[in-house]
């Protein structure tokens, strides 16, 4: 009988755990849907800013101020700034493992080359995994808030801008998981600075803004003084009027700020969506495993009960035969 009691207790415990994992699965599914909506709404803005920054590469560097040129050129013999985005909580499968593994491999490679390293870590899990081995490299650590917070973006951006302006780093790379679907997250290593040529990953078809319209001249092209910029939308060439609030010099500076902010925002949204997708999948698997375990325990319970009943019947029959 004690065996039956243990089985019933275990079944009750597994059912309780199953309710928790199911609830977590539903919560993660809801959060993932909201973040996917945020990503869709911000894609146009992020891609447009990236393309404008890429277009600056076609401008003669003497058109830019010395401060602005720092964001487009590599500074030799300075630290490599690595921004690592992980989760604040666990129970999300291999979400953090793939990021941490790649960061450790890259750090080892940089150490072998004798290069300097600085780490900005976002998320408790990444900090816990890296602090013991690379505590001397950690420049900053930020906890990931429960909801998407612009203050976090601004703090990280200020760290990056300050490091570049003070010539403390030669480049800046961000590590995050890119969301593909609930079951698939792609470990991504993306260079933020120096600004690289924009690579279209066919997210959406958006206008490509030509900075010639801002009064800057392309290499080998005479300056254009009009106040119109061109845009290519699905193969069509259209002219778009813009209202400018900044002069040419301050425009680039503000665009650099927008660019860095948009890249951090993009990585944070992708990382959050990937985290919730990974957690939803992990909790779904846990719920299914709990269901399978309950079925096995119930079967074992029924067999044990049947064995006890059979034994009692045999004893009764044996007793009646003696009488």
UniProtKB/Swiss-Prot annotation:
| Keyword Lipid biosynthesis part of the UniProt annotation | no
Regions that span the bilayer: none
Compartment(s): Cell inner membrane
Q: How does it sit in the membrane?
A: Peripheral membrane protein
> What GO terms are given for molecular function?
ATP binding; proton-transporting ATP synthase activity, rotational mechanism
InterPro entries listed in its UniProt record:
ATP_synth_F1_ATPase_gsu (IPR035968), ATP_synth_F1_gsu (IPR000131), RPE2 (IPR022436)
Question: Among its keywords, does the record have Metal-binding?
Answer: no
One cellular component term (GO) for this entry is: proton-transporting ATP synthase complex
> Which residues, by range, are in coiled-coil regions?
none
Q: Which keywords describe this protein according to UniProt? A: ATP synthesis, Cell inner membrane, Cell membrane, CF(1), Hydrogen ion transport, Ion transport, Membrane, Transport
Question: What residue spans carry the region label Insert?
Answer: 206-240
Q: Name one GO biological process term.
A: proton motive force-driven plasma membrane ATP synthesis
**Record text on subunit structure and interactions:** F-type ATPases have 2 components, CF(1) - the catalytic core - and CF(0) - the membrane proton channel. CF(1) has five subunits: alpha(3), beta(3), gamma(1), delta(1), epsilon(1). CF(0) has three main subunits: a, b and c.
In the record, the note on similarity to other proteins reads:
Belongs to the ATPase gamma chain family.
Q: What is the protein's known function?
A: Produces ATP from ADP in the presence of a proton gradient across the membrane. The gamma chain is believed to be important in regulating ATPase activity and the flow of protons through the CF(0) complex.
Q: What is this protein called?
A: ATP synthase gamma chain
Q: What is the lineage of its organism?
A: Bacteria, Pseudomonadati, Pseudomonadota, Alphaproteobacteria, Rickettsiales
């Amino acid at each position: 009988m004690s065996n039956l009691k243990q089985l019933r207790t275990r079944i009750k415990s597994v059912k309780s755990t199953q309710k928790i994992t199911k609830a977590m699965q539903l919560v993660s599914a809801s959060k993932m849907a909201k973040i996917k909506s945020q990503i869709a709404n911000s894609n146009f803005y992020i891609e447009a800013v990236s393309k404008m920054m890429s277009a600056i590469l076609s401008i003669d560097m003497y058109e830019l101020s010395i401060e602005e040129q720092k964001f487009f050129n590599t500074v030799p013999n300075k630290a490599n700034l690595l921004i690592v985005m992980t989760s604040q909580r666990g129970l999300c499968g291999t979400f953090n493992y793939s990021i941490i593994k790649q960061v450790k491999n890259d750090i080892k490679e940089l150490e072998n080359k004798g290069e300097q390293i600085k780490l900005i870590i976002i998320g408790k899990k990444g900090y816990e995994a890296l602090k013991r081995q690379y505590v001397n490299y950690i420049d900053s650590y930020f906890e990931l808030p429960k909801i998407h917070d612009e203050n976090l973006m601004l703090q990280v951006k200020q760290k990056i801008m300050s490091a570049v302006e003070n010539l403390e780093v030669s480049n800046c790379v961000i590590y995050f998981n890119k969301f593909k679907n609930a079951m698939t997250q792609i470990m991504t290593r993306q260079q933020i600075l120096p600004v690289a040529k924009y690579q279209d990953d066919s997210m959406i078809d958006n206008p490509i803004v030509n900075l010639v319209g801002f009064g800057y001249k392309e290499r080998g092209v005479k300056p254009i003084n009009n106040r119109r910029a061109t845009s290519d939308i699905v193969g069509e060439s259209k002219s778009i009027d813009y209202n400018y609030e900044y002069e040419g010099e301050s425009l680039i500076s503000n665009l650099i700020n927008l660019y860095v902010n948009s890249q951090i925002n993009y990585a944070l949204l992708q990382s959050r969506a990937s985290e919730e997708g990974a957690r939803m999948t992990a909790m779904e698997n846990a719920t299914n495993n709990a269901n399978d375990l309950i079925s096995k325990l119930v079967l074992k319970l029924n067999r044990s009960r049947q064995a006890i009943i059979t034994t009692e019947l045999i004893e009764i029959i044996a007793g009646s035969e003696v009488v």
